[in-house]
Design a protein with these regions (language model features):
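Rhodanese-like catalytic fold shared by cysteine-dependent sulfurtransferases
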Residues: 1-32, 39-74, 83-126
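Short, surface-exposed ligand- or partner-binding patches at beta-edge/loop junctions that are enriched
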Residues: 78
């Protein structure tokens, strides 16, 4: 029986991953930067320009949103440490998307490299 880690390892064999240093250029060239973490994780801090489509909704969102129909979209994905992003990249490739990349190490690697993260600011009350 396969574990989640087995599935992630298998997914990583068939996808394109970029490290944190390559990620900046990949993000600039991307049509979509997608954070596949859950909404609460996204709201605690995310990469600038990222949209949140949680892993559990990804295939449904791409199947039902006409703006996401083009299989030529240049897509960069990330999650906490790259497991969910790898599974997401594999799914999108299986759906026919041609240009999908995952950031190796996810937002944890991004933050470890001291790259900027957008965090929400709440209004101050006196």
């Amino acid at each position: 029986m396969k574990t989640a880690h087995d599935l992630v390892a298998a997914a990583k064999q068939g996808i394109s991953e970029v490290d944190v240093e390559q990620a900046e250029a990949a993000i600039q060239a991307a049509d979509l930067l997608i954070d596949v973490r859950e909404a609460d994780e996204y709201h605690s801090g995310h990469l600038s320009g990222a949209i949140n489509i949680p892993r559990g909704l990804l295939e449904f969102k791409f199947s039902n949103d006409e703006a996401l129909n083009s299989r030529d979209l240049n897509i960069v994905l990330y999650c906490k440490n790259s497991g969910r992003a790898a599974l997401s990249a594999k799914s999108l490739a299986e759906m026919g998307y041609l240009h999908v990349q995952s950031i190796t190490g996810g937002i944890e690697a991004w933050q470890a490299a001291n790259k900027p993260v957008v965090t929400p600011s709440l209004p101050e009350f006196d």
